[in-house]
Amino acid sequence: MAHQSHAYHMVKPSPWPLTGALSALLMTSGLAMWFHFYSTTLLTLGLLTNTLTMYQWWRDVMRESTYQGHHTPPVQKGLRYGMILFITSEVFFFAGFFWAFYHSSLAPTPQLGGHWPPTGITPLNPLEVPLLNTSVLLASGVSITWAHHSLMENNRNQMIQALLITILLGLYFTLLQASEYFESPFTISDGIYGSTFFVATGFHGLHVIIGSTFLTICLIRQLMFHFTSKHHFGFEAAAWYWHFVDVVWLFLYVSIYWWGS
């Protein structure tokens, strides 16, 4: 291994950004093909390419950080700034959906009947499944914090237990959300109410699935003794992301389910 006189990680050439871009092209093209021609070939190919890219890219990052020691304190600091900027970009992403919702609901047009929810729309009861979903996500926020504290105290067993509980709560939330969609009295094509509801809650649901995957990777890494109380940014980033998902849901619940109904 060549001598290095600085603390920064000079990343070697990697094919994964290219295969990741290719998978994104295949998935977006595949979605268009699915919507218009009911063909899922491109979409399936895109999902497969994306899964393989993620697996191999994460494998490389884990090798560089855990086994090769490239993630020095200055590198970890840069990764922290990167994660903060990423979550900030996600905040603005969801801000667009809330803007669309409030723009339509605070001044409903005559086409909507002059009131909100629009004529003919029966909104979901915010005190039923949505309230249960809120409780589930708040509980998962508590359990992920428990996992973090356990890791800082080198309590391996409790960390694994708390992380597993968080993942199970995330899966339970996803199942509840899916059942709510199936039983919903309106669809995404039911005007501005249906489109804003399903796009905002659907993208949040996608983020819950991504967060659950992120935490599952962290659980596997913890089982393989990858994390210590001093070296665990992968888990810390997952915890930040999960708390962000929790906060977004609280805004969704108050805005769309409770006030919007």
Swiss-Prot record:
Pfam family, one: COX3
Gene3D superfamilies reported in the protein's UniProt record: 1.10.287.70, Cytochrome c oxidase, subunit III, four-helix bundle
Keyword Oxidoreductase included in the entry's annotation: no
EC numbers on record: 7.1.1.9
Regions crossing the membrane: 16-34, 41-66, 73-105, 129-152, 156-183, 191-223, 233-256
One Gene Ontology term of the molecular function aspect: cytochrome-c oxidase activity
Residues exposed to the Mitochondrial matrix side: 1-15, 67-72, 153-155, 224-232
EC class: translocase
Highest taxon of source: Eukaryota
Mitochondrial intermembrane side: 35-40, 106-128, 184-190, 257-261
Coiled coil: none
Gene Ontology CC, one term: respiratory chain complex IV
Alphabetically ordered keywords of this record: Membrane, Mitochondrion, Mitochondrion inner membrane, Translocase, Transmembrane, Transmembrane helix
Subunit structure: Component of the cytochrome c oxidase (complex IV, CIV), a multisubunit enzyme composed of 14 subunits. The complex is composed of a catalytic core of 3 subunits MT-CO1, MT-CO2 and MT-CO3, encoded in the mitochondrial DNA, and 11 supernumerary subunits COX4I, COX5A, COX5B, COX6A, COX6B, COX6C, COX7A, COX7B, COX7C, COX8 and NDUFA4, which are encoded in the nuclear genome.
Family of this protein: Belongs to the cytochrome c oxidase subunit 3 family.
Described purpose of this protein according to its UniProt entry: Component of the cytochrome c oxidase, the last enzyme in the mitochondrial electron transport chain which drives oxidative phosphorylation. The respiratory chain contains 3 multisubunit complexes succinate dehydrogenase (complex II, CII), ubiquinol-cytochrome c oxidoreductase (cytochrome b-c1 complex, complex III, CIII) and cytochrome c oxidase (complex IV, CIV), that cooperate to transfer electrons derived from NADH and succinate to molecular oxygen, creating an electrochemical gradient over the inner membrane that drives transmembrane transport and the ATP synthase.
Name recorded for this polypeptide: Cytochrome c oxidase subunit 3
Taxonomic source organism: Pan paniscus
Gene coding for it: MT-CO3
